[in-house]
Amino acid sequence: MTTREKLEAARRAAPVVAELSTESKNALLLALARTIDERTEEILAANRADLEASGLDGSLRDRLLLTPERIATMAEGLREVAALADPVGETLAEWERPNGLRIRKVRVPLGVVAIIYEARPNVTIDVIGLALKSGNAVVLRGGKEAVRSNECLVKIAGATPGMPDGAIQLLDASNRESVQQLMKARGLVDVIVPRGGAGLIQFVVENSTVPVIETGAGNCHIFVDESANLDMADRIVINAKTQRPSVCNAAEKLLVHRAIAKEYVPRIVKLLLDHGVEVRGDAETLALAQGMQVAEATSADWDEEYLRLCMAVKVVADVDEAIAHINQHSTKHSESIITANDAHARRFLRAADSAAVYWNASTRFTDGAEFGFGAEMGISTQKLHCRGPFALAELTSSKYEVIGSGQVR
């Protein structure tokens, strides 16, 4: 099938998927989970072929890699989505007008949801599960490095007994034109979600005529305030930077209050270096960390999402300078303040203009499952149509049901 034919098939499937009962959707998800468990070796073989052909290493290879444990996690994720409440048909509000009209606002599927993503085959199953549970047809355009893994997974999903014909479409990853056609498919596709690096997201935002929900890019900050518990700060900074550095909710920048910088900067820089982190710093950081392996930060560093074991450190005068720096340089993803000062914390929570703001906790919690939403399509860093974890409820829109008894205006 051509790209156009696949998009048209998804459009035809959308109303069929939207009409599926909760029981039918859950049965599909559970059946797919069982099949994934049963066909683990087939999926691993496809993934091994991708790994051999890709030539990737480091964090990029890790994103592409599937293991028996990761495949089991994919299947378990489908079971978790099946256990979640169905958002479709949920009553958001209802009221009666003085003229007797009864109005009800209800959740409905978006229709056809497309996702453009890089070499992460686990995303394929996550998105299929979320799309089905929220009553949407789905169009997938993964990275060329994961082409065999994605083809295997979509083939398995599409063959699930009871799956509406055309509900899951995989576009040709070797054909760059497929992305161009997808981005211009207004009327066939209701929304595109680009999930990946800043370059991919910006390309889709600038070129798509289909509505776009931005996700992913995470230049996340931690600010250690003057009243911070420094042992707590150590734990949070190391977790946020090193636990999984290649993901979007990993911290990339550390801001330290000047009042504690003399004590804390050398301490945290040593700890970061001991954990294998490349450290870059502003002039004050360099002066305070003399004798340590710290590179001078450039102006570009403050805007860069490293996605690796690298962190830039800056000394700031106070919470207001920290907020100003964050609002100028962040990607509006996740920011955290470590402080014992309630007033400073509440100012930070109110004024830091990002999707998730934390007080005394790691930025690594910005995740659908960690927030209790189940799996998610990504983290939305824009303000419309949703912000933060892009989970089941965010894969719906709303409509108004108006019931009368012959009223005219």
From Swiss-Prot:
Cellular localisation: Cytoplasm
GO CC terms, sorted: cytoplasm
Enzyme Commission (EC) number: 1.2.1.41
Source organism, top-level taxon: Bacteria
Pathway: Amino-acid biosynthesis; L-proline biosynthesis; L-glutamate 5-semialdehyde from L-glutamate: step 2/2
SUPFAM superfamilies registered for this protein in UniProt: ALDH-like (SSF53720)
Catalytic function, reaction form: L-glutamate 5-semialdehyde + phosphate + NADP(+) = L-glutamyl 5-phosphate + NADPH + H(+)
GO MF, one example: NADP binding
PANTHER family: DELTA-1-PYRROLINE-5-CARBOXYLATE SYNTHASE, GLUTAMATE SEMIALDEHYDE DEHYDROGENASE
Family statement drawn from the similarity comment of this UniProt entry: Belongs to the gamma-glutamyl phosphate reductase family.
Described purpose of this protein according to its UniProt entry: Catalyzes the NADPH-dependent reduction of L-glutamate 5-phosphate into L-glutamate 5-semialdehyde and phosphate. The product spontaneously undergoes cyclization to form 1-pyrroline-5-carboxylate.
UniProt name for this protein: Gamma-glutamyl phosphate reductase
The organism of origin for this protein: Koribacter versatilis (strain Ellin345)
